[in-house]
Curated annotation (Swiss-Prot):
Name of the protein in question: Parvalbumin alpha
Source organism per UniProt: Amphiuma means (Salamander)
Stated role: In muscle, parvalbumin is thought to be involved in relaxation after contraction. It binds two calcium ions.
InterPro entries the UniProt entry points to: EF-hand-dom_pair, EF_Hand_1_Ca_BS, EF_hand_dom, Parvalbumin
Keyword list, A-Z: Calcium, Metal-binding, Muscle protein, Repeat
Species classification: Eukaryota, Metazoa, Chordata, Craniata, Vertebrata
Length: 109
């Protein structure tokens, strides 16, 4: 589970920062989680947890549930937040985020 990668207290802090009404900001989310300070192996582990269908990609519907991937308390992203994050992360334009793209997205945060 995600708590094997990131301490639960950090997950809770990050999830609560983006309650309903708070615009989702991936960079801020990554910093609150401390994900940018984790090892590449941990970032890859987080990716695989978010990749619910084990396709090797985070598709748009999985991206919309990214906060829920960290905690069931998390809200769904709005359609606009999801699209914005997809555009930011999808470097090769295939409409989904691969592990290398996810790692880059975290590293750039």
């Amino acid at each position: 589970s995600m708590t094997d990668v990131i301490p639960e207290a950090d997950i809770n802090k990050a999830i609560h920062a983006f309650k309903a009404g708070e615009a989702f900001d991936f960079k801020k989310f990554v910093h609150l989680l401390g994900l940018n300070k984790r090892s590449p192996a941990d970032v890859t582990k987080a990716f695989h947890i978010l990749d619910k269908d084990r396709s090797g990609y985070i598709e748009e519907e999985e991206l919309q549930l990214i906060l829920k991937g960290f905690s069931k308390e998390g809200r769904e992203l709005t359609d606009k937040e999801t699209k914005d994050l997809l555009i930011k992360g999808d470097k090769d334009g295939d409409g989904k985020i691969g592990v290398d793209e996810f790692t880059s997205l975290v590293a750039e945060s």
